[in-house]
Amino acid sequence: MFFFESFYYFYSPKTKLFYNEMKHIRLIFSAILLSLVVPCGYAQTRQDSLAIAHAQWHTDTLKHGAVCMYTNIHVFDSPQQISIIKYDPKKYKTQIVQAPQMTMTSHLAKENQAEAAINGSYFNVKTGAPTTFIRLDGIVRGETTRAEAFRTDGAISTDKNKIKIHTFDSITSKKLGKKYKNILAAGPLLLKNGVRQMAPTFPENTGKATKGNAHSSDVPQGFFKRHPRAFIGITPDNQIMMVVVDGRFKKHSVGMSIDELSYLAKQLGMRDALNLDGGGSSTLWNNKTGIVNHPYD
């Protein structure tokens, strides 16, 4: 499987924990009306909370205390496989890096002596260029396009080994860009300070992110339906969780809607969480077992 070589990685003096933005070429969705903002999916119930709370996790310990774990559970009235890599950011230096050309995730991870990897934000499938705001070493490498503005309401910064998730729009991008040398925009924002963010922020975000120039035709048809998903979260004790939910496997894992994903992030105990590029891009990797999940485009 090939990916675009724009990526992020985390590393310590001895070992690198790699967070990459390799992009798998996927289908482009057609448009739906902007007014259709209620995420489709199965209503969350107490049974869903219990299923997540009592999930049987298969775990594998990585270097410097990082843990890779996965589970197959029945939640939201559907089968789901959830894979997680959790680590302490105090034991790793975090960086955002943009690579020059296409390569396989595993190859790039090995080249950087990575401990683990996950895909990042959105990109242009024709050119490989980022389509969300990205600033590296104080230099802006990409701006959020109008087509991505509707879902780009969050960002992750990695300065001074402190991982933070922020709210993001056309106004905050300037402030964040001045404050942080390394920052990447993505979205939708799933959690902020323990509060689920998707429902209240989406209707307003499209106009904010593009200074009122976005249109309903920019929203991909099916965005709110169940798909493979990837996201990154921070727990109250500042542990980092990189998560992938497999999708498009009817009997194995159908994937989640954005609404279901924010519910999952909350149930996993996260304080802040940010959705990343999903679909065929959703990949979680570590240097002990290789690709942990089952990517499907």
Which positions does each model-derived feature cover?
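Short, solvent-exposed aromatic-acidic interface loops
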Residues: 98-103, 168-175, 245-250
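Short beta-strand scaffold segments in enzyme catalytic cores
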Residues: 83-86, 154-157, 189, 230-234, ...
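Bacterial Sec-dependent N-terminal signal peptides
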Residues: 1-49
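Active-site-adjacent helix-turn-beta-strand microarchitecture at beta-sheet edges
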Residues: 128-222
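Zymogen propeptides
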Residues: 44-167
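Conserved, well-ordered active-site substructure
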Residues: 127-150, 215-271, 281-297
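Hydrophobic residues embedded in beta-strands of well-ordered beta-sheets
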Residues: 92, 161-164, 196, 240, ...
